[in-house]
């Protein structure tokens, strides 16, 4: 029996999404894995969870069963210290950091696990950090010859000192409409579609409430498509392109992703998408991703333009990633990810 330590929750705004992903995984994981659920509260406390609530978008609560990580590298064993002072040890083979957003998919938890020499599922420190920071994603991918949208970076600490200068430079460089988003947030938190100049300052302030810096880029009148990638027996497998039909907002926001009904169109029926698998694979390898990821593109008249890379895509029942592989059940998608990571552990 293989033992999987499942990390979920976390300190980011995507805490509840991580919770829902963990709940879905627990319901569908195959019997050859024993799962050790370790939740991270919104305050950053690691707690051992003997059960996970059936609430779809729940919250990790401090139940008094605190988790103590190993004090030496290479030890795959946690200590659970109970509220009354008693403790016990739990061994594991592999960690799955099923975390979204900052302190989860930005390289921080990956760095902790690397320091402890603990094997884990998903991309390492560099790929996680580079993919989470949209500014550096654009720099790295544009240098690799992958088309990206032009962008303007506003660092939070400089915004209030040079507000008028930033606004002038943006209006000189771009034509409206624009799209403003935090540089390091996920699930569309802090994103705003900006039609007019007067809306721009508020949109930037909103983005900076959700991230350390903000990105401004053209708001394309172009469909967004999604390509999921998974390593299967050492071979990178690309899904068909997915288009999401949704109503309401002008972009695929949090409500559309997790709360409102949507329709997945697989494969997406658009011209100018030839070679998408090669482009997605190039992005995956350029950043050094591993095991699984999701690459998001805009479909323009001249072809695909990279939007974002997600090294820890949502694994809820409503998420794009597990739905992308039409020939695979949810449980097969999870098993393929775990098998890819476990094979590397056993080498």
From Swiss-Prot:
Primary location: cytoplasm
Cofactor binding: number and manner: Binds 2 magnesium or manganese ions per subunit.
Ranges for domain ATP-grasp: 138-339
The family this protein is said to belong to: Belongs to the D-alanine--D-alanine ligase family.
Residues that, per the record, bind Mg(2+) 2: 308, 310
Binding site for Mg(2+) 1: 296, 308
UniProt cofactor(s): Mg(2+); Mn(2+)
Role: Cell wall formation.
Pathway: Cell wall biogenesis; peptidoglycan biosynthesis
Residues reported in the UniProt entry to bind ATP: 171-226
A GO biological process held by the record: cell wall organization
Enzyme Commission number(s): 6.3.2.4
GO cellular component, one term: cytosol
Name listed for the protein in its UniProt record: D-alanine--D-alanine ligase
Molecular function terms from GO: ATP binding; D-alanine-D-alanine ligase activity; metal ion binding
Reactions mediated catalytically: 2 D-alanine + ATP = D-alanyl-D-alanine + ADP + phosphate + H(+)
Compartment list: Cytoplasm
InterPro entries: ATP-grasp, ATP_grasp_subdomain_1, D-Ala_lig_Van_CS, D_ala_D_ala, Dala_Dala_lig_C, Dala_Dala_lig_N, PreATP-grasp_dom_sf
Entry-linked NCBIfam families: D_ala_D_alaTIGR, PRK01966.1-4
Keyword list, A-Z: ATP-binding, Cell shape, Cell wall biogenesis/degradation, Cytoplasm, Ligase, Magnesium, Manganese, Metal-binding, Nucleotide-binding, Peptidoglycan synthesis
